[in-house]
């Protein structure tokens, strides 16, 4: 019977142990997996559906900024790394909740002094147990601290997801801007080529000098050089966009990108400035992460204060000595005589003060970032509106020149010059629009709330409507 009990206890002990399973890292296999990523992944389609972007066709025929952002959230290696930190923090909660294991010791002793009968062995056999008992609620304090640190890791995951979104938006805007500028410059090159041919024709007819022809040729070559530079930037921004999405550049070969999102910009008057700043100061992801870390420092201080009270160790034991059964029960505690844990308490208190100072400094930085971003956005929007008015006037002027040309009042060279002026105004308009999008992106980064809805109007960034939702989850299996 006793052997069966020992066998059952041994099996329970072995069954509770975790076995080691090797997971070798193969660089070649990992590289193949990264290079084979495609935008028509069935898992990505399910991810889009879960986020309310159910495609009518698969693969999608057109991808807008919202779609590409979801692709990045699905594929991003940065998010995968941060999820491992979240999983590590969750494991830390398990570690914090563990109770100390009891210990068992066995001993033998030889009693050579006492004269015992011949049939009595001089050897004594015994065993001791050590049962540690934590006091002052230390286990609960450790669990709360670990939960606060896990909460900070989860907010850091959200911060990483926001950074992924921001990076995709920034590179998407740069890519679209490059496409539009290239198209505009292609038209300018075509117009300047026609102007050069007109001057060549006039020079052959003796109606102009070679200086005019050479100046037109220089202007044409300058436009071509600028076009080459813009096309190079466009290609580089395409690669950068693919990298921001966690895809190889070739994955975008069959992707048709919708550029309509770039044209959306809310009026500064539509932005609820008090709500914007308040939301940033109280609900930004890094603010909430700092709050969790401060709460963890509070629990760490509480734990060090609790460590003033020593843990108790119960020590029941049994010995068999020359036919006598000896039972024992004792306990031990460390004596807080030489120190009462003053050093660790002082360190924990200063760490809490440091966490408070870091939180206050972060809030001040956020406040300045929001105010600066708002000022830059208003200025960029004012410049953009001025360029938009100028573009409308330039279009009207070009139409007037077209009518005059049709009536024979101006020559073709004047018509082409008006087209060049219109293209130059469009180039300035595109640059102003790019600047608006950049400053809007900076403002959104300052608040960490999307400020443009599908209608292009400003959104209320109150935490009740936006920030209490948690859009960043682990959707990609490991």
Region spans (language model):
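Terminal intrinsically disordered/low-complexity segments used for targeting and assembly
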Residues: 1-71, 231-279, 442-478
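Periplasmic alpha-helical coiled-coil/stalk elements that build and connect Gram-negative outer-membrane
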Residues: 18, 139, 148, 155-279, ...
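Membrane-embedded beta-strand positions in outer-membrane beta-barrel channels/transporters
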Residues: 69, 126-128, 172, 277, ...
């Amino acid at each position: 019977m006793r052997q069966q009990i020992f066998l059952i206890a041994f099996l329970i002990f072995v069954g509770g142990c975790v076995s080691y399973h090797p997971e070798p890292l193969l660089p070649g296999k990992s590289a193949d997996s990264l290079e084979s990523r495609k935008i028509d992944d069935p898992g990505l389609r399910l991810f889009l559906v879960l986020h309310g972007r159910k495609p009518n066709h698969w693969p999608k025929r057109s991808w807008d900024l919202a779609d590409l952002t979801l692709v990045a959230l699905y594929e991003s290696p940065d998010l995968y790394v941060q999820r491992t930190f979240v999983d590590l923090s969750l494991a830390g909660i398990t570690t914090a909740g563990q109770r100390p294991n009891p210990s068992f010791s066995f001993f033998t002793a030889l009693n050579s002094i006492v004269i015992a009968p011949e049939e009595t062995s001089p050897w004594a056999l015994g065993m001791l147990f050590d049962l540690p008992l934590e006091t002052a609620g230390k286990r609960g304090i450790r669990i709360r601290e670990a939960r606060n640190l896990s909460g900070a890791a989860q907010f850091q995951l959200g911060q990483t997801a926001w950074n992924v979104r921001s990076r995709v938006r920034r590179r998407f805007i740069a890519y679209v801007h490059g496409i539009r500028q290239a198209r505009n410059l292609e038209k300018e090159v075509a117009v300047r080529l026609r102007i050069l041919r007109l001057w060549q024709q006039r020079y052959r007819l003796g109606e102009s000098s070679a200086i005019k022809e050479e100046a037109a040729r220089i202007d044409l070559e300058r436009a071509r050089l600028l076009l080459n530079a813009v096309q190079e930037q466009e290609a580089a921004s395409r690669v950068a966009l693919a990298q921001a999405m966690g895809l190889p550049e070739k994955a975008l070969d069959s992707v048709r990108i919708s550029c309509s999102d770039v044209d959306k910009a809310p009026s500064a008057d539509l932005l609820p400035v008090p709500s914007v700043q308040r939301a940033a100061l109280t609900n930004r992801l890094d603010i909430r992460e700092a709050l969790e870390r401060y709460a963890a420092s509070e629990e760490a201080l509480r734990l060090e204060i609790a460590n003033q009270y020593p843990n108790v160790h119960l020590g029941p034991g049994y010995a068999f000595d020359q036919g006598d059964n000896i039972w024992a029960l004792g306990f031990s505690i460390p004596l807080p005589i030489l120190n009462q844990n003053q050093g660790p308490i002082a360190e924990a208190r200063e760490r809490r003060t440091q966490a408070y100072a870091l939180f206050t400094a972060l809030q001040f930085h956020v406040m300045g970032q929001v105010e600066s971003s708002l000022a830059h956005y208003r200025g960029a929007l004012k410049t953009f509106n001025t360029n938009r008015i100028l573009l409308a006037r330039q279009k009207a002027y070009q139409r007037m020149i077209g009518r005059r040309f049709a009536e024979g009042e101006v020559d073709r060279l004047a018509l082409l010059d008006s087209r060049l002026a219109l293209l130059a105004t469009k180039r300035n308009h595109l640059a102003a629009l790019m600047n608006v999008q950049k400053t809007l992106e900076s403002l959104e980064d300052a608040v960490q709330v999307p400020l443009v809805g599908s209608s292009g109007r400003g959104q209320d960034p109150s935490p009740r409507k936006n920030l209490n939702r948690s859009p960043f989850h682990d959707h990609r299996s490991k």
